[in-house]
């Protein structure tokens, strides 16, 4: 498959709805194309809101990023975990 035919979508999940709202605002300020949406069932069984970013995302550091639960990349077929809070704990 030609890489130019699709873009990577990043799904960023949060511990709270407020975290999602703040992250979306920061993305928009940085020129990152994003929108809020329900969390896909394959990423979480809990009801919640996530931010969908196209082509790039803001990394999990800086203001409000303690609200990020995980970042997953969707390549058109499957999700791959890019960042997860549990993986960062020692």
Task: Identify the role of each PLM range.
Residues 6, 45, 65-66:
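A short, structural micro-pattern
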Residues 7-9, 19, 30, 37, ...:
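Residue-level marker of intrinsically disordered, low-complexity segments enriched
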Residues 1-4, 38:
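A short alpha-helix capping/helix-coil boundary motif
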Residues 11, 17-61:
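Amphipathic, hydrophobic secondary-structure cores in small proteins
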Residues 57-90:
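C-terminal structural segments of small proteins and small subunits
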Residues 3-13:
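Short glycine-/aliphatic-rich beta-strand segments at the starts of folded cytosolic domains
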């Amino acid at each position: 498959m030609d890489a130019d035919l699709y873009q990577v979508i990043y799904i960023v999940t949060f511990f709270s709805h407020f975290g999602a709202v703040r992250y979306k605002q920061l993305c928009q300020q940085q020129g990152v194309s994003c929108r809020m949406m329900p969390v896909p069932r394959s990423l979480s069984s809990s009801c919640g809101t996530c931010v969908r970013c196209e082509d790039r995302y803001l990394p999990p550091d800086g203001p409000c990023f303690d609200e990020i639960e995980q970042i997953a990349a969707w390549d058109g077929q499957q999700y791959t975990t890019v960042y997860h809070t549990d993986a960062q704990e020692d």
